[in-house]
Amino acid sequence: MLHISKWERHSNSSRDALGAAALNFCKNAKSKDGVHGAKFYWPNPNLIAIIIEAETGSWGIAAEPDGSTMKSFFDLGDAASCIMDETWVDASLGQKRSDKAS
């Protein structure tokens, strides 16, 4: 699964603070079992996009966060507002779930 989010910098937050929070968030995600990758990108100077690739249930709403994960979320939230948050399911998992309805 891909967990994709976009974060817009608060006007009272520096770009350095946003970049540091995003980096720490990605480092935290990569430290979790089942997370294969976590990167952030700058689409423009006031916006970051975070892409986390993880096995189902190891990141996102289905995973119970620990203290360090919650701190990384809160630190990111102090620097920016989440303006988009999506989970993309790969084709094979999507097909397996669709087949259950048949």
Question: Where are these predicted regions, by residue range?
Answer:
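Short, low-order "capping/linker" segments at domain edges
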Residues: W88-S102
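Short glycine-/aliphatic-rich beta-strand segments at the starts of folded cytosolic domains
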Residues: M1-S11
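An amphipathic, aromatic/His-enriched active-site/gating alpha helix that lines ligand/cofactor pockets
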Residues: K27-G37, I52-W88
